Amino acid sequence: MPGTSVSDLSTATAVDAPALLPLPVARPSAPAVVRGKLYIKTHGCQMNEYDSAKMADVLAASEGLELTDNPEEADVVLVNTCSIREKAQEKVFSQLGRWKALKAGGKPVIIGVGGCVASQEGEAIVKRAPYVDLVFGPQTLHRLPELIRARRESGKSQVDISFPEIEKFDRLPEPRAEGPSAFVSIMEGCSKYCSFCVVPYTRGEEVSRPFEDVLVEVAQLAAQGVREINLLGQNVNAYRGAYGADAGDPAQYADLGLLIRTIAQIEGIGRIRFTTSHPLEFSDSLVDAYRDVPQLANCLHLPVQAGSDRILSAMKRGYTALEFKSRIRKLRAVRPDISISSDFIVGFPGETEADFEKTMKLIEDVGFDQSFSFVYSRRPGTPASDLQDDTPETVKQARLARLQAHISAHAASISQSMVGSVQRVLVEGPSRRDPNELTGKSENMRPVNFPGNPRLIGQFVDVLITEAMSNSLRGRIQLDDSAH
């Protein structure tokens, strides 16, 4: 039921949708008085980008800090870290070493380390870099104002890397839209414990935000002009959002499919995406959402990691290559032209040439559009870090190059096949290449550049694709026949 107003959601009847209380519509809040400058450097995933935006919101609301692109003029400098790749810790300490000079002459700059490296290292960061004032984890970013005040009052570095369930979302200010597309975190952590991954140790186990809390945030963003919602989670399709307990009844739980159906009813929301998924949790309910919800973007990022069952077992992924392909077949039965992207780890300990060929066979069978692919990176403290790894680095790099070349060639053929088609594009702003043109993204995440009036920014337009290039598409706005 697209176009349903937020206040009508209490009577909306999507398939299996629960009765909802009316959701508040966002009203612009008075801007905070600017009392200082904030600089944030972000490494890693979209979840970190979301968290950094929330850090900025928290500190703007509580401390009056305004973002700056120059750390030298900032009163608070934060690095939001990622521990997925090798040598992440050393990169953080290199960054901190450069920032140490910011305190020269006794300037009272607050230096903070957040994110997953902070969760892993904790007090060790302060011991190695005693000029660091704050160390906080992904689940405690909402406590930044208290940590800053405690640091200033006590003169001692503050460390808080606890996992206080979902508390941080209850204490975040109203979201602020920064363009027509926005991220909304719907859950935190992961309980899959893949043998190569640090996420369960740095972000904790899976905790879902309450169903109605997510809807409130989406409604607030929609009221500010957001038209595309990107639902975020480390294992987003494991979402189980509680609802209904406030009425005295036992809580019920909404899965991702139901959440998508309900978000699609919120006025103004024209496109929904989600990331990152786990194949084990890719349910029939989600396939049905792809069948029934036109706002759900015609693309999916579903990390498979490898095509060899032996390697998948060693990774503790919980599925086989055949089971993965079965899920893709179900999805393509309802969305035949859906774009599929994935993650791959090349050179996992014990990977043979035969194992790698099975990965290449899977890639050929599925026809992936894009990939995030890397050579295996040993992460301390994970089960895989104890496995013997005797494959030469040159072999791993050669395999990676072959895999990436294959997927890139297929992606190029998909782009070429889009020439002559009409694509629905959300206009994001002026093109970087040519400020006299507009740019936006197609449903399958292709940047599209085209001539157009800046008044179209924030709207969906139909664009006839006229040219495919290596990393983008060109086109022209397709006028409705009724306009002639």
UniProtKB/Swiss-Prot annotation:
TRAM domain ranges (all copies): 416-479
Binding, [4Fe-4S] cluster 2: 190, 194, 197
Domain (MTTase N-terminal): residue spans on this chain: 36-153
GO MF: 4 iron, 4 sulfur cluster binding; metal ion binding; N6-isopentenyladenosine methylthiotransferase activity
Predominant place of localization: cytoplasm
Catalytic activity: N(6)-dimethylallyladenosine(37) in tRNA + (sulfur carrier)-SH + AH2 + 2 S-adenosyl-L-methionine = 2-methylsulfanyl-N(6)-dimethylallyladenosine(37) in tRNA + (sulfur carrier)-H + 5'-deoxyadenosine + L-methionine + A + S-adenosyl-L-homocysteine + 2 H(+)
Entry EC number(s): 2.8.4.3
Cofactor, free-text remark: Binds 2 [4Fe-4S] clusters. One cluster is coordinated with 3 cysteines and an exchangeable S-adenosyl-L-methionine.
Residue ranges occupied by any Radical SAM core domain in the UniProt entry: 176-415
Listed InterPro entries: Elp3/MiaA/NifB-like_rSAM, Methylthiotransferase, Methylthiotransferase_CS, Methylthiotransferase_N, Methylthiotransferase_N_sf, MiaB_methiolase, rSAM, rSAM_horseshoe
EC class name: transferase
Annotated stretches, region: Disordered: 428-450
One Pfam match: TRAM
Location(s), subcellular: Cytoplasm
Cofactor(s) for this UniProt protein: [4Fe-4S] cluster
Annotated positions binding [4Fe-4S] cluster 1: 45, 82, 116
Function as written in the Swiss-Prot or TrEMBL entry: Catalyzes the methylthiolation of N6-(dimethylallyl)adenosine (i(6)A), leading to the formation of 2-methylthio-N6-(dimethylallyl)adenosine (ms(2)i(6)A) at position 37 in tRNAs that read codons beginning with uridine.
NCBIfam families: miaB-methiolase, MiaB/RimO family radical SAM methylthiotransferase
Family stated for the protein in its record: Belongs to the methylthiotransferase family. MiaB subfamily.
Record's protein name: tRNA-2-methylthio-N(6)-dimethylallyladenosine synthase
Source species of the chain: Xanthomonas oryzae pv. oryzae (strain PXO99A)
